Design a protein with these regions (language model features):
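Active-site loop/helix belt of alpha/beta enzymes
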Residues: 1-121
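C-terminal accessory subdomain/extension
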Residues: 119-218
Length: 218
């Protein structure tokens, strides 16, 4: 990036290179979720003045853009030639304020199919470090082929749920590089059918009335 005070010198410098063409000028907001704040307004002012200085000097700016999801929803003055919606494309609100302006519906879901089922004995450990041990009999452990190499944070180990047949079932053991395990535990008051190889489970999304959102995962 180029500091706003050096933009014009930078553009003048590259103008002497025949192999370089300016296709666009942009910035990325640090505090777009606070459009009434001083920092946001100052960054808007600096960017606008830098763009105008380039134009006044006779140079082409190309496509001017800076509005991310919150800025595109909350401040139309910063739309310029295009907007850069990121998290909003997934139907997720970037901040509380944007939720008052526009309703967004989540459109992304993550599914996986069971690759292994097991019925370990009571007291047996599951996963690296045995951070989960089977507490009793009639616990089914299912393996799903997603891990931290796929973006599933290892910090969620033993803390997240997945959906199976409209029910929440607990992830157990440490999340591995390319797989993790869940435990299906039934009791007389609440019976959950055991899973089979190839059954689908939902990591993010909706199944009947049950839902796991990206906000929950975060």
């Amino acid at each position: 990036g180029v500091h706003y005070t050096q933009v014009l010198d930078f553009v003048r410098g590259i103008s002497f290179h025949r192999g370089i063409q300016c296709d666009g000028v942009f910035t990325h907001f640090a505090t777009a979720d606070e459009p009434s704040g001083w920092d946001y307004k100052l960054q808007c002012q600096r960017f606008t003045e830098a763009v105008q200085a380039i134009k006044d000097a006779g140079f082409e700016c190309g496509i001017v853009h800076c509005a991310n999801t919150p800025s595109s929803m909350l401040d139309s003055s910063m739309h310029f030639d295009m907007i850069r919606a990121g998290i909003g494309l997934y139907g997720l609100q970037p901040c509380e304020l944007s939720g008052r302006v526009m309703q967004l519906d989540p459109v992304m879901s993550v599914h996986a199919r069971v690759t292994r089922v097991a019925h370990p004995a009571m007291g047996e450990g599951v996963g690296y470090g045995f951070t989960y041990r089977v507490p009793r009999t009639r616990v089914q452990i299912c393996t799903l082929p997603i891990g931290y190499a796929d973006g599933l944070s290892r910090t969620l180990s033993n803390r997240m749920d997945v959906l199976y047949r409209g029910e929440r079932v607990r992830q157990v053991g440490n999340i591995c590089m390319d797989q993790f395990m869940v435990a299906i535990q039934s009791n007389p008051a609440h019976e959950i059918p055991e899973a089979e190889y190839g059954d689908e489970m939902i990591i993010v999304g909706r199944d009947g009335d049950a839902e796991i959102t990206m906000d929950e995962m975060a």
